[in-house]
Regions:
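Sec/Tat signal peptide C-region and signal peptidase I cleavage site
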Residues: 20-25
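Leucine-rich solenoid repeat scaffolds
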Residues: 299-345
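Parallel beta-helix/beta-solenoid
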Residues: 40, 45, 67-69, 74, ...
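Extracellular beta-strand/beta-solenoid scaffold signature
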Residues: 29-39, 57-65, 81-92, 111-129, ...
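Bacterial N-terminal signal peptides
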Residues: 7-18
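Positively charged n-region of N-terminal signal peptides that target proteins for export
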Residues: 1-5
Length: 345
């Protein structure tokens, strides 16, 4: 597993994207929030509480919240059709709090889905010193997203993510999806979610993750995240994630573990993948990379997880010169606490 390859993959999850959307079927209003030089448009801006149908076809965002509003709740809603974000909570300019519960957020991306690096169903961010974005994402059904299911970014963001069903496309060769991502110093917990079908079969040096905790490589570390009692993948075809849980917090040179403790916890998760579909995660031309749990950090705890299936049966685990398949990969970790995990081929 080459850290630079995976770093470039994970950064793309948040920082890239190339197009601004098709002709509008909704009333799409500029938000003042820019991505990829575009002033993002939204079908709804600071609407307070929302339920029911939100058809955002033609807009960049379905429902947009920022500090100029009073926050709100998205409950029992059906949000679809935007090409960048289904629900976006932007706390850059001040405190913003939104609950997203019992809702369906789907078909977020281009039509058809393609390899441009955007399309996130539920997105929280607070990337300034004075901002915050908080809330709960629970009981939601998230599917048919282009890049990511649920993403929480930056040190001012803190979200509890629990009881959601997040379904990727299965093995696809055009983009490396991630199911749930907490990164760039964000806080939160990820508990009792079901995440399946995040798998990349292309040749561009990438692996997908069911749950990704991302930091380091010159960015803030993401620390103290609890990942507990999630179901990641299943024995059904196309349900596996290339990496069940990826804890990725390298040093500033992106070549090894950081100097500070990351203290992330992966406990009591069921992680399954019966297929070998990744061919480039260990570097283009070198081979694939799949792992039940990947740890790049310091003093992380990997305890009492059940890992099974051909897709995580160890073969050349830790190699950087050929396809590497791991149940638990701590080859780039320091002081990892690995205890009472059950690994079944």
């Amino acid at each position: 597993m080459k850290l630079g390859v995976l770093s470039s993959l994970f950064v793309a999850a948040l920082l890239m994207g190339l197009s601004s959307g098709p002709a509008s079927a909704a009333t799409c209003t500029p938000t003042g929030f820019f991505r990829d030089t575009f002033n993002m448009t939204a079908a709804m801006i600071n609407p307070g509480d929302v339920s029911g149908e939100v058809d955002a076809t033609g807009c960049n965002i379905g429902i947009y919240y920022d500090a100029s509003g009073a926050g709100g709740t998205v409950d029992s809603a059906n949000v679809h059709g935007a090409n960048y974000f289904g629900v976006a909570v932007n706390g850059d300019a001040g405190a913003t709090s939104v609950e997203v519960t019992n809702s369906s957020v789907h078909d977020i991306g281009e039509t058809p889905l393609n390899g441009t690096q955007h399309g996130v169903a539920i997105y929280y961010r607070a990337c300034t010193a004075s901002g915050s974005a908080t809330g709960t994402v629970s009981g939601d059904t998230v599917f048919n997203y282009q890049k990511g299911g649920i993403v929480v970014s930056c040190s001012g963001a803190g979200v509890s993510i629990g009881g959601n069903t997040v379904t990727g496309q299965g093995p696809v060769n055009y983009i490396a999806q991630n199911g749930i991502q907490v990164g760039y110093g964000a806080a939160g917990q990820v508990m009792k979610n079901t995440v399946t079908g995040n798998s990349y079969s292309g040749t561009n040096g990438a692996s997908s993750a069911g749950i990704l905790i991302y930091g380091g490589c010159g960015n803030p570390l993401t620390t103290g995240i609890q990942i507990v009692k999630n179901t990641l993948g299943s024995a059904a075809p196309a349900d596996g994630n290339d990496i069940g849980v990826a804890l990725f917090n390298p040093d500033p040179t992106c070549s090894g573990p950081p100097s500070l403790s990351t203290n992330n916890k992966v406990i009591n998760n069921k992680i399954t993948n019966e297929e070998l579909t990744n061919v480039s995660g260990n570097a283009p031309g070198v081979g694939g990379y799949q792992a039940g749990i990947q740890d790049v950090g310091v003093n992380d705890k990997l305890i009492n997880n059940k890992i099974d299936g051909l897709g995580y049966t160890p073969s050349n685990c830790g190699s950087t010169t050929m396809t590497s398949i791991c149940a638990i990969d701590t080859s780039a970790a320091s002081k990892a606490k690995v205890h009472a995990n059950a690994v079944t081929p």
